[in-house]
């Protein structure tokens, strides 16, 4: 029971100090994650376009 109280107290202290520090490292990580998401989105859009073209070719050949 006391361990939980100490753990909560440490979490609150950490949250207070973490909120006051510069978010430089967190911002860098966020930008990297955002860039990965953008690349994934772009690759998905390109793949869908290629698949649609392939389906059109197949439909044209089928008659």
Curated annotation (Swiss-Prot):
Q: Which InterPro entries match?
A: Cecropin, Cecropin_insect
Q: What keywords appear on the UniProt entry?
A: Amidation, Antibiotic, Antimicrobial, Immunity, Innate immunity, Secreted, Signal
| Signal sequence region | 1-21
One GO biological process this protein is involved in is: antibacterial humoral response
Keyword Signal tagged: yes
Give its localization. Answer: Secreted
Q: Which residues form the propeptide?
A: 22-23
**Principal subcellular localization:** secreted
Cellular component terms per the entry's GO annotation: extracellular space
**Pfam families from the UniProt entry:** Cecropin (PF00272)
Lysine amide: which positions carry it? 62
Q: Could you tell me what this protein does?
A: Cecropins have lytic and antibacterial activity against several Gram-positive and Gram-negative bacteria.
Give the family, as the similarity comment puts it: Belongs to the cecropin family.
The protein, known as = Cecropin-2
Native species: Ceratitis capitata
